[in-house]
Amino acid sequence: MTSTKQHKKVILVGDGAVGSSYAFALVNQGIAQELGIIEIPQLHEKAVGDALDLSHALAFTSPKKIYAAQYSDCADADLVVITAGAPQKPGETRLDLVGKNLAINKSIVTQVVESGFKGIFLVAANPVDVLTYSTWKFSGFPKERVIGSGTSLDSARFRQALAEKLDVDARSVHAYIMGEHGDSEFAVWSHANIAGVNLEEFLKDTQNVQEAELIELFEGVRDAAYTIINKKGATYYGIAVALARITKAILDDENAVLPLSVFQEGQYGVENVFIGQPAVVGAHGIVRPVNIPLNDAETQKMQASAKELQAIIDEAWKNPEFQEASKN
């Protein structure tokens, strides 16, 4: 894959609610020239139907080849996006999904790599930080070419919540959620700003917002998935658009800074896990992490979040099957 290639090809693995919403976002936004959709054999006809349905929108958007794909179609793809996995049920945490989804992930990654794929993996199935790690292990790919959606959606939720609280456009809010995409994530309050004005200073000039309100706002962001799952069964629109944004950054070689699940090599005192932090991303994957200078409390939260993920990974990798399949 090179940044000068004009025909951009994406393979989507998993045509459930998230996958099909992502495909729809790609069509709406005119991203990529080719989209192949892979499903398990018993759901292949659904992928055929979705490809046909999506193709009927092309006269209103831009040309794109859309079809139900096989793993062999991954060989010349620029990007393989993995959304396939067991869904999160009411009452389940993302980490509860580990056992079911690691086995699914191993099967997918093995078949993609066997096709001769040389592009970039983008992982969205949950628990995303753990499955990004397993994709790296099972693929043998360089860490830069394995990316998780990380806290991209959480950060978008955070910005939207702050925007509503402050009555400003969310696009003018610059604030990140870091750590696990899940219960141990945290808000980087120390660097939240509105158009360059530190949040604390901005609040002084606008209105009297109590600390308790900000804590409640963050908790609403952290628990948003549970709220949505309890009301409609699943979340898919927000993450689909987040994935489309990451896809555009990769295919257009933007060198955009986005909060992603990124491999840690000592930043924040954390190593050997993929976890949510801002990073520069372009045509060759992760260019470099952007290491926000966290305060002491935030650094401790980052380390605690990573420790939880590491414990899950260590337990999972006691499975000899996963050990044998590891290439990194």
From Swiss-Prot:
Q: Show the active-site residues.
A: 181 (proton acceptor)
Molecular function terms from GO? L-lactate dehydrogenase activity
What name appears for this protein in its UniProt entry?
L-lactate dehydrogenase
Q: Which InterPro entries match?
A: L-lactate/malate_DH, L-lactate_DH, L-lactate_DH_AS, Lactate/malate_DH_C, Lactate/malate_DH_N, Lactate_DH/Glyco_Ohase_4_C, NAD(P)-bd_dom_sf
Query: Subunit notes for this chain?
Result: Homotetramer.
| Localization, UniProt | Cytoplasm
Phosphotyrosine (modified residue): where?
Answer: 226
Q: Which residues bind substrate?
A: 88, 94, 126-129, 154-157, 235
**Regions crossing the membrane:** none
Gene that this polypeptide is encoded by: ldh
Q: Which GO terms describe its biological process?
A: glycolytic process; lactate metabolic process
